[in-house]
Amino acid sequence: MSKPLPLVTRQGDRIAIVSGLRTPFAKQATAYHGVPAVDLGKIVVSELLARSGVAPELIDQLVFGQVVQMPEAPNIAREIVLGTGMSVHTDAYSVSRACATSFQAVANVAESIIAGSVTVAIAGGADSSSVLPIGVSKALARTLVDVNKARTLSQRLKLFSRLKLRDLLPVAPAVAEYSTGLRMGDTAEQMAKTYGISRQDQDALALRSHQMAAQAWQQGLLHDEVMTAYIPPFSDAITEDNNIRKDSTMEQYAKLRPAFDRKHGSVTAANSTPLTDGAAAVMMMSESKAKELGLQPLGYLRSFAFSAIDVWQDMLLGPSYATPLALDRAGITLADLTLIDMHEAFAAQTLANLKMFASDSFAREKLGRSQAIGEVDMSKFNVLGGSIAYGHPFAATGARMITQTLNELRRRGGGLGLTTACAAGGLGAAMIVEVE
């Protein structure tokens, strides 16, 4: 076990998260069709600033992420600063840790506050699966470079004449791991088979996610943390997530065919998170700065941890590796948690991680620990639903989970919450948040 690692400044200040906000999340090619991630980021940060009452010139830094990169805006963070009326002197840089990107943004801001180089900052992420960087073939790309260096028209025409018709076809972004060629769904299928996770259990978790998310919206629990987003030319607005199935049944889920292993698989579109557009952000500062500004923090960041594992087998087990570290650094156990929010990339991945949390053999063989961190009390788990229901704009999910968990802890009178996620490349993230 690791020793506790308090997240405090030299003056003993804790890291306060004073506010959090997100856009409604929308399925690919629906409400945000044609709206790039950078615009979604501007929308949410502008509204976060307006609601916070914090003067824009007080923001020292903005750390933001985007997984599906757009060549025309490689530093999304700086574009958001320049497009939201913030001071041009506000520092800004972008990060990417796949599905854990906004976890990384929050961690970076926390470390800067601890170091004393930043007092007030914004962290978050945005992604669009509707506005994609459609590329060209390698042959055409190479030819275009050569054409740019050619001196005469005849040289240019000769270069183009070597191309074949297929070289002119557009190339969609890759959906597989660069290093292995495996899709996320392939790994989810492998984990379902390895750990004996049935199709019925996957469908049941997906149904639970949608039911709880629908209930959260019906009870008005999300209204304060989800803004109304107006879509250019601003005649239309989206007020709620549009992926949530409010009246689905197990019978409907059972009718769907497997999406990856067509013959023997159990992972379907219904028990997986969909491609999604959206943005989310949190405002962070030192505890003393929050007091100085008269702000009541949503809560505090108690600890965080990241992990990296093999990409060929069990690539989505990141939460099972990162969570024990985050618990140790916070000086607590799984039983001390009031809430647990785990990113549901796939129902199979989620259920596999829950099994590993409770597995003594996994703890001994993979983590070098004497025993498992424990079995998860499902009454604490994803109590407002998860990513299968809300959707998953890759870089925004972490900020959504943190904000959602803090608000729910406040409704329950305080406590400790775990937010954790798997990520492409065998990465994992876990954060412990606290509300008094």
UniProtKB/Swiss-Prot annotation:
It catalyses: an acyl-CoA + acetyl-CoA = a 3-oxoacyl-CoA + CoA. The keyword Transferase applies. It is an enzyme of class 2 (transferase). The active site is at C99 (acyl-thioester intermediate), H392 (proton acceptor), C422 (proton acceptor). Its EC number is 2.3.1.16. One of its GO terms (molecular function) is acetyl-CoA C-acyltransferase activity. GO terms for cellular component: cytosol. It is found in: Cytoplasm. One of its GO terms (biological process) is fatty acid beta-oxidation. The keyword Transport does not apply. Keywords: Acyltransferase, Cytoplasm, Fatty acid metabolism, Lipid degradation, Lipid metabolism, Transferase. Pathway: Lipid metabolism; fatty acid beta-oxidation. InterPro entries: Ac-CoA_C-AcTrfase_FadI (IPR012806), Thiolase (IPR002155), Thiolase-like (IPR016039), Thiolase_acyl_enz_int_AS (IPR020615), Thiolase_AS (IPR020610), Thiolase_C (IPR020617), Thiolase_CS (IPR020613), Thiolase_N (IPR020616). PANTHER family: ACETYL-COA ACETYLTRANSFERASE, CYTOSOLIC, ACETYL-COA C-ACYLTRANSFERASE. Heterotetramer of two alpha chains (FadJ) and two beta chains (FadI). Belongs to the thiolase-like superfamily. Thiolase family. This is 3-ketoacyl-CoA thiolase.
